[in-house]
A protein has these predicted regions:
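Short, conserved catalytic or interaction motifs in soluble domains
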Residues: 23
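C-terminal motif of bacterial Sec signal peptides marking the signal peptidase cleavage site
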Residues: 19-20
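Glycan-processing catalytic domains of CAZymes
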Residues: 27-438, 445-471
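Bacterial N-terminal signal peptides that target proteins for export
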Residues: 1-9
Length: 471
């Protein structure tokens, strides 16, 4: 049974305004302090310690012999577009480097060009190596370093994308690779993205690319997360769960359970977690997301304590010919819905993500340094939230009324921080927060800052929208 906090009646609406104290009310105490809650983050060196990581897969590609893409899309404009969308990290795929050749190789020249453009527009760049297994042996690592040392002369070089969705069988090798990488590049990120709970048992054991198998168990998934953290010792845990499947407004079950498992295990290990946002479609059941669906994914992740947000995908993948969108037989770019088409044109999804990132950039800077305490649920939820994560109240907050909502509860240096989310992808509405006494609230909503003062704070939230409250 879900715990919910008491429903309170309220009238009127106030989005972000300043309300004076009635003569009988006690003024807010600006020095009120609570016990501090630990906070964990991974700093991407190029971005700085107070910039919230906002990543995307994949970077603008170049023409190459493996995937015969007809043009080189690495350009200054392409990286300006990345930055203008609010994304500050980009992961390579087709634009791979090659440590078995020299810096004069066209592949490495293309990566260097990407790094220079990324530096100009303040985008952290994660390289993808053709031969990352060279990190297994010290003598091979020495050869790899010749290339990486050149990359490292450009500040935007932020690490390497090692493997996407590995299985349990890969963890020992990944551990050895990370140890070698960390010897020489301790300030860079050894990046690996992990699978969701709906991966099959065979995929969790052997890696996503193997396919097949039976539905996995939660116990196996917990082992998968724990073993990766204990063996590989990542700087953060990145994973994906794509919930917008089948017909709108269905949301795939298990979304919050997956976040809960990852949040719990990373907190034990004292590392942060990053998560991917579904920003494309594929197959016959994964749909193109609306603005509300993008907002809901990002904002529920923030409410659960995510310290990094990533989008799949920025550039549309290719088919084997390199001339058409990949993975999606007989579909156009518009029917796929990534941020940028396979030939470099901005699509509707680009502007949806850009809209979401306005608030994410501002609120994320504060949440990055906040310790997560739990979730308050008001009303119904499209997916069940694990009982162990639910709070009935938090510090000064004693009641909630209005539309279905989630309130992520945080601490920042002994002060209360709340992240309020409209927990619907269909309807907008008002959420009222009732406090035990008069409070002065600083509010970040839609990238803008305002304030309210009183025993009640009221927010009007679009479907899926989130707002940050600092007391």
């Amino acid at each position: 049974m879900n715990k919910t906090i008491s429903t309170l009646l309220g009238v009127g609406f106030l989005l972000v305004s300043l309300v004076g104290c009635a003569p009988s009310e006690k003024p807010p105490d600006p020095n009120e302090q609570y016990e501090k809650i630990p906070s964990y983050k991974h700093t991407v060196e190029f971005l700085g310690e107070n910039t919230f990581p906002i990543g995307a897969w994949m970077a603008p590609p170049y023409d190459n012999e493996v995937t015969p893409i007809p043009e080189n899309y690495i350009s200054e404009q392409a990286f300006k577009d990345i930055a203008d969308s609010g994304i500050n990290m980009i992961y390579a795929l087709y634009d791979r480097c090659d440590n078995t050749t020299t810096m004069q190789d066209s592949r490495n020249i293309n990566v260097m060009n990407s790094l220079r453009y990324a530096e100009k527009y303040k985008v952290a760049y994660f390289a993808r190596d053709w031969n990352e297994m060279a990190l297994m042996e010290e003598e091979d690592t020495a050869e790899m370093r010749k290339i990486y040392d050149e990359f490292d002369k450009i500040p935007s070089f932020s690490g390497i994308l090692v493997q996407d969705e590995p299985g349990l069988v890969h963890f020992d090798n990944l551990s050895a690779m990370k140890k070698n990488f960390d010897k020489y590049f301790p300030q860079k990120t050894f990046y690996t993205n992990m699978m969701p709970t709906y991966a099959t048992d065979n995929q969790l054991n052997q890696g996503a690319a193997t396919g097949g198998g039976s539905p996995s168990t939660i116990e196996l998934y917990q082992k998968y997360v724990k073993d990766f953290i204990s063996k590989v010792k990542p700087q953060m845990f990145s994973y994906d769960f794509y919930p917008m499947m089948n017909e709108f407004p269905n949301i795939e079950k298990g979304y919050f359970e997956n976040i809960s498992i990852v949040a719990s295990e990373t907190a034990k290990a004292k590392i942060p977690f990053w998560t991917f946002i579904q920003a494309t479609s594929w197959g016959g059941n994964v749909r193109i997301c609306t603005q509300a669906e993008i907002d809901w994914q990002v904002n529920t992740s923030l409410a659960y304590g995510a310290k990094g947000i990533q989008y799949f995908s920025y550039w549309t993948p290719y088919d084997d010919s390199g001339t058409h969108p990949g993975y999606y037989p007989n579909r156009t770019d518009e029917q796929i819905g990534s941020m940028v088409s396979h030939d470099g044109k901005k699509q509707d999804m680009y502007y949806r993500v850009q809209n979401t990132n306005r608030n994410l950039t501002e609120a994320g800077e504060i949440l990055l340094n906040c310790g997560f305490a739990g979730i308050i649920q008001h009303g119904e939820s499209p997916d069940e939230i694990p009982e162990k994560d639910l709070l009935t109240d938090f510090r000064q907050l004693k009641g909630v009324s209005g539309v279905d909502a989630l309130i992520g509860c945080f601490d920042k240096d002994g002060k209360t921080v709340l992240y309020v989310v409209n927990n619907s992808i269909v309807k907008e509405g008002e959420v009222s927060l009732q406090f035990e006494k008069n409070v002065k609230a600083s509010i970040v909503q839609d990238g803008k800052t305002g304030s309210q003062e009183g025993e009640t704070v009221k927010l009007k939230l679009k479907a899926g929208e989130g707002a940050l409250i600092c007391l």
